[in-house]
Amino acid sequence: MTDRSAAPINASLKAADPAIAGLIDQEQMRQETHLELIASENFTSKAVMEAQGSVLTNKYAEGLPHKRYYGGCEHVDAIEELAITRAKQLFGAAWANVQPHSGAQANFAVFLALLQPGDTILGMDLSHGGHLTHGSPVNVSGKWFNVVQYGVDKETQRLDMEAIRKLALEHKPKLIICGYSAYPRSIDFAAFRSIADEVGAYLLADMAHIAGLVAAGVHASPVPHCDVVTTTTHKTLRGPRGGLILCRDAEFARRFDKAVFPGSQGGPLEHVIAAKAVAFGEALQPDFKAYSRQVVANAQALAARLQERKIDVVSGGTDNHVVLLDLRSIGMTGKVADLLVSDVHITANKNTVPFDPESPFVTSGLRLGTAALTTRGFDEKAFHEVADVIADRLQNPEDDAIQARCLERVSDLCKRFPLYAPALEPALA
């Protein structure tokens, strides 16, 4: 028998590609030694990463379970069925498709199933907290459809449901989209359902940012009210990067299945679907509810402390994991603030605020999220410390001594709340 132990297929990453292994180690170190406040990011469990890094990456499986175009799918069929069952249980849905590669892919599949080019859609303006796929002119959704956009009230910086209703009555959209990427308040899905029924529109909820909160019962669920719900599987859900489509009515199921495959994708990523199944299973456990409650409590603590430090927060607070700072209150742009906090190992992102006078490349806002640091074990007291570091840095941008102290405080927080315990093995170990 030929000895294949030295074959390239058996080489470790360190041996096969030390350049990539080294860069992975650097990213691992960054995650461990920086404070992650990007609202769309989180840290998965080791189990999720183990599933995603498994031999399932080798398997092609076009089609749905037991309706594949390839042989040898009996095990990935069982895995995908388990992911579907868990997703339906987690969100109380009648049907689920776990194959979308991303939230954007999930949204595109919904458009393909329900709309024709030129149809009218009603979605939130990107600069008010919407998403690119909700009709932004730079996205395919804004190029293929007639887009009408709504925003928030200028005074309250919250959704004005009567204003949205008037737009719907005027333009008669075929699809109304709710669910956002930078809206810190709760969404009244029942009110959107009422508007959709009044104008005869389909209702899509994109709950990508709040899916984990919905699963835990911390935010109202869109599933009972919407014709279709899309989400990512990372963010507050704490799974792998991927997408998911849910609906409450089996009438739509076949249309959405066909819109995913063959309509907009080829073979599903079965290794990612396995990781989704693991994450759904984790989210079904009681401790995930406690985690999600802490995510919101931490966001509210962060927002309150920053307001005490005289930094304005859009809408005056938050009901979810997002805290959106309006930096006009301290005479600063989001672009500058992003660089300043990055210098002290805090990762966030510049973001437009409602009625922003700055361009999307500059912005007047800084978006923060609490999901990732809550995974590390941060509580309200720790987030008060985080808020003080942010405020000290932004309010003293030229003070080198304060910058050095901020770096020390960030380092101390990272040591007090390690990311993984025990730590992950370096790829170059």
Swiss-Prot record:
The modification N6-(pyridoxal phosphate)lysine is found at residue 235. This is Serine hydroxymethyltransferase. Its main location: cytoplasm. It is found in: Cytoplasm. Belongs to the SHMT family. It comes from Synechococcus sp. (strain CC9311). InterPro entries: PyrdxlP-dep_Trfase, PyrdxlP-dep_Trfase_major, PyrdxlP-dep_Trfase_small, Ser_HO-MeTrfase, Ser_HO-MeTrfase-like, Ser_HO-MeTrfase_PLP_BS, SHMT-like_dom. Its EC number is 2.1.2.1.
